[in-house]
């Protein structure tokens, strides 16, 4: 009998968790999706924080994790976190940015579970996603 295939970069213990990917750069959405989808995560991508917020509000159940860029048009990743946490206070987030560092959170009440600086390696993303989901 064949054993199930598990990607050597991840544990494979994600049970099809739903992840929202939010970034205004389509190539980065495709990259993150290509890294996470083969591990069994269900992925929904959004090119704007407002679109992700609309989907979040309309969803029957919230995503397990929202991975969002910080700097986007009209609404930042921190704005998205704050709006989602008003609805679902325990919503898990991973903030990704190439323009700010983790010190951005000291200025406000909203904190993601983790921060990942761009550019990142596949293993860094996988490890952080697994760590956030394990919390």
What residues fall within each predicted segment?
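Hydrophobic/aromatic residues positioned on beta-strands within the core alpha/beta folds
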Residues: 96-98
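Receiver (REC) domain active-site loop signature in two-component systems and cognate sites
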Residues: 72
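Acidic catalytic/metal-coordinating carboxylates
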Residues: 47-51, 76-79
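Conserved acidic carboxylate
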Residues: 23
């Amino acid at each position: 009998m064949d054993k199930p295939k598990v990607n050597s970069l991840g544990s494979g213990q994600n049970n099809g968790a739903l992840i929202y990917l939010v970034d205004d750069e389509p190539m980065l959405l495709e990259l993150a999706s290509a890294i996470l989808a083969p591990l069994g995560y269900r992925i929904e991508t959004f090119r704007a924080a407002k679109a992700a917020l609309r989907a979040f509000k309309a969803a029957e159940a919230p995503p397990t994790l929202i991975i969002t860029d910080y700097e986007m048009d009209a609404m930042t990743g921190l704005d998205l976190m704050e709006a989602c946490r008003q609805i679902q206070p325990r919503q898990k987030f991973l903030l990704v940015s190439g323009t700010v560092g983790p010190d951005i959170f000291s200025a406000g009440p909203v904190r993601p579970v983790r921060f990942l600086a761009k550019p990142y390696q596949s293993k860094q993303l996988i490890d952080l996603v697994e760590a956030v989901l394990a919390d």
